[in-house]
């Protein structure tokens, strides 16, 4: 059996992406009213999370998703594993495969780590474990893009034809890359707004419009996705000061007033309140930040189902 993976948002067809969004809604409905939030969908499956970067939302939501589906979830961190003794990622992956893991969920600072993991653990008669990319360097974060798309669909009633403005540190953002690819697949119009220094080389080849003027883009926006400036990936010199960046690219009360009443504000977290987004905006009725977190659990349930069981019987399994 060839294992199913989720390594990049661009690997998803339109039909697969929509099926995952639909399955996420089904799993959410299947849990409504249950005193014990448990579905038998993945009983007997072992899911291992491998987080080599700090995380709250993604790590916790994957763990909750697995447990709500009755999987056995094992957490592996760099500090608590043989990696701290010098073991390579490849040897760790092969060890987990030999131990019987059905799925490996990886977050790693190196771009391409998830695809390497899938290659390293493949090639045996059983096909190896499924690999899910929970964020690799500045490359991709496909489950974040899926939960963002689900949130937009829930708030706006659909994605196709919607104008989504992504603002901030595009250069270092795996969230931006995955959202661009997935939203394009689902028929949205994507606009990137950032200073020239925070745009990647080759962005002209992406299926997007690029702007440096946030005020000009907000009135026509259906959704605005604000990104954190990733100072941990910078050596300085990308913009003059935090104050100037916030003045030019922060979503303030004044800028929120430029949005249509239907528009939704998103942020993948963690938020730098007062820098890229004002606290009053983050806590407003137009903000879907907490809805994104809730959707993250349901999307990751759907993704685990997709890679471990398959899409064809999601409705039957989800309702079990």
From Swiss-Prot:
Pathway: Pyrimidine metabolism; UMP biosynthesis via de novo pathway; (S)-dihydroorotate from bicarbonate: step 2/3. It comes from Mycobacterium marinum (strain ATCC BAA-535 / M). Transmembrane segments: none annotated. Belongs to the aspartate/ornithine carbamoyltransferase superfamily. ATCase family. Heterododecamer (2C3:3R2) of six catalytic PyrB chains organized as two trimers (C3), and six regulatory PyrI chains organized as three dimers (R2). GO terms for biological process: 'de novo' pyrimidine nucleobase biosynthetic process; 'de novo' UMP biosynthetic process; amino acid metabolic process. L-aspartate binds at residues 85, 174, 228. The keyword Transferase applies. Carbamoyl phosphate binds at residues 57-58, 107, 141, 144, 269-270. It catalyses: carbamoyl phosphate + L-aspartate = N-carbamoyl-L-aspartate + phosphate + H(+). Keywords: Pyrimidine biosynthesis, Transferase. This is Aspartate carbamoyltransferase catalytic subunit. InterPro entries: Asp/Orn_carbamoyltranf_P-bd, Asp/Orn_carbamoylTrfase, Asp/Orn_carbamoylTrfase_sf, Asp_carbamoyltransf, Asp_carbamoyltransf_Asp/Orn-bd. One of its GO terms (cellular component) is cytosol. The keyword Amino-acid biosynthesis does not apply. GO terms for molecular function: amino acid binding; aspartate carbamoyltransferase activity. It is an enzyme of class 2 (transferase). Catalyzes the condensation of carbamoyl phosphate and aspartate to form carbamoyl aspartate and inorganic phosphate, the committed step in the de novo pyrimidine nucleotide biosynthesis pathway. Its EC number is 2.1.3.2.
């Amino acid at each position: 059996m060839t294992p199913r993976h989720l390594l990049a948002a661009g690997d998803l067809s339109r039909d697969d992406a929509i099926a995952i969004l639909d399955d996420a809604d089904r799993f959410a409905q299947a849990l409504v009213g249950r005193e014990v939030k448990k579905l038998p969908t993945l009983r007997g499956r072992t899911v291992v999370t491998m987080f080599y970067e700090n995380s709250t939302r993604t790590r916790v939501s994957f763990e909750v998703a697995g447990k709500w589906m009755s999987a056995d979830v094992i957490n592996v961190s760099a500090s608590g594993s043989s990696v701290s003794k010098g073991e390579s990622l490849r040897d760790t992956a092969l060890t987990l495969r030999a131990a019987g893991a059905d799925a490996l969920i990886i977050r790693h600072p190196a771009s391409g780590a998830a695809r390497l993991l899938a290659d390293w653990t493949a090639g045996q008669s059983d096909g190896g474990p499924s690999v899910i990319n929970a964020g690799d360097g500045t490359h991709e974060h496909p489950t974040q893009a899926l939960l963002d798309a689900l949130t937009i669909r829930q708030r706006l009633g659909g994605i196709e034809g919607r104008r989504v403005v992504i603002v901030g540190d595009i250069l270092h953002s795996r969230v931006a890359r995955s959202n661009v690819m997935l939203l394009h697949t689902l028929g949205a119009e994507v606009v990137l707004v950032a200073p020239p220094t925070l745009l990647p080389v080759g962005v002209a080849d992406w299926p997007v419009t690029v702007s440096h003027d946030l005020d000009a883009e907000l009135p026509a926006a259906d959704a605005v996705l604000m990104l954190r400036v990733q100072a941990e990936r910078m050596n300085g010199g990308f913009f003059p000061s935090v104050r100037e960046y916030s003045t030019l690219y922060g979503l303030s009360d004044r800028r929120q007033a430029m949005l249509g009443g239907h528009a939704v504000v998103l942020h993948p977290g963690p938020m730098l309140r007062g820098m890229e987004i004002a606290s009053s905006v983050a806590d407003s009725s137009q903000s879907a930040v907490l809805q994104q977190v809730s959707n993250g659990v349901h999307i990751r349930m759907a993704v685990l189902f997709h890679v471990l069981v398959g899409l064809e019987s999601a409705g039957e399994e989800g309702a079990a």
